[in-house]
Amino acid sequence: MAPHSDFIGEIGLDFSRQGMSSKTIQERLFEEVLSTIRDRPRFITLHSRGAEGAVLECLRRHGIKAAVFHWFSGSIKVLEDVFAEGHFVSINPAMIASASGQRVVEKSPKDRILVESDGPFTKVQNQVCSPPKVALVYQYL
């Protein structure tokens, strides 16, 4: 199905403590998906928890541009590289409620930001981040 789709997501790598047990298979499958979809431009959303640099390197190897890094939480150096390569980041209400998320927003060019709710999986102040909550992100920006 992926070879025929214009929208691919959410794909990527999770090198958090929970994800490390499947690191090898994640890397193999991610490389496989990227090699399958690199033939033409597509809208791609990425999961990169604890693996931002590794995900960016995979995109470079496959010549993929303009992907969206969902809830970027990596270093500012990697964030700068993400933008230098032509990619985007998505910002959600939980990010603007944390110091690290605010740093990502501050270092992100406005024309490289997409907003999202990430609901119903995320909460801010004990409230589920539903789509109407993205207004908080717009106000913050």
Model-derived segments and spans:
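His/Asp/Glu-enriched short active-site or ligand-binding loop at hydrolase and phosphoryl-transfer sites
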Residues: 84-100
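Active-site phosphate/pyrophosphate- and oxyanion-stabilizing loops and adjacent acidic/basic residues
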Residues: 102-103, 139
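Divalent metal-binding pocket/active-site signature
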Residues: 1-85, 103, 122-132
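Mid-to-C-terminal alpha-helical segments outside catalytic/metal-binding sites
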Residues: 131-141
